[in-house]
Swiss-Prot record:
Residues 147-179 are lumenal. Its main location: plastid. HAMAP family: PSI_PsaL (MF_00447). The chain crosses the membrane at residues 125-146, 180-202. This is Photosystem I reaction center subunit XI, chloroplastic. It comes from Hordeum vulgare (Barley). Residues 1-40 form a transit peptide.
Length: 209
């Protein structure tokens, strides 16, 4: 007696095809690869020391203590710079910074300027140094006008990182910054004139002039 044959439905054929389909390469193997190496973290027996850490162990200060910044030699050098000598008036600090800039700018302008091969290269270098000092003075004035308001107290902190009280820096005020800018301009012009006097009036035996 013959049995009836029922053809499979299309959905069953599709499911069986999807179940049997696997990605195969040239050799018929699966394309997925498993890593054959294992990374292990080995704990060192020697104790490690943190070289860079927050100042005073407080991460909320927002500054880091490194072997350079915490060195007594670096602290001594920075404390002797004019910008950090709070006991000196802003006018005198500006004069000191300006003298250094004006004195050192004459040489590069005289030796590398467009008139370096002419008899007036010294005068041209001096005028170039004075011009740059004037431009820097204008920039300092613009910074002071944009950063400080007339009559407001100093924005400098009155506490050190160790908690010691100190007097607020007068440089961080509109009046103090104005004095610093005026001192910088006067010191820069004086330094340039003094360098010209030593190089080309007294005619000292400098190697470069």
């Amino acid at each position: 007696m013959a049995t009836a044959y029922a053809p499979p439905m299309a959905s069953q054929v599709m499911k069986s095809g999807l179940a049997c389909s696997k990605p195969r390469g040239m050799s018929g193997a699966s394309l997925t690869r498993r890593p054959r190496f294992v990374v292990k973290a080995v704990k060192s027996d020697k104790p490690t020391y943190q070289v860079v850490q927050p100042i005073n162990g407080d991460p909320f200060i927002g500054s880091l203590e490194t072997p350079v910044t915490s060195s007594p030699l670096v602290a001594w050098y920075l404390s002797n710079l004019p910008a950090y000598r709070t006991a000196v008036s802003p006018l005198l600090r500006g004069i000191e910074v300006g003298l250094a800039h004006g004195y050192l700018l004459v040489g590069p302008f005289a030796l590398t300027g467009p008139l370096r091969n002419t008899p007036v290269h010294g005068q041209a270098g001096t005028l170039g140094a004075i011009g740059l000092v004037s431009i820097l003075s204008v920039c300092l004035t613009m910074y002071g006008v944009a950063s400080f308001n007339e009559g407001e107290p100093s924005t400098a902190p009155v506490l050190t990182l160790t908690g010691r009280k100190k007097e607020a820096d007068k440089l961080q005020t509109a009046e103090g910054w104005s004095q610093f800018t005026g001192g910088f301009f006067f010191g820069g012009v004086s330094g340039a004139v003094w360098a010209y006097f030593l190089l080309y009036v007294l005619d000292l035996p400098y190697f470069f002039k």
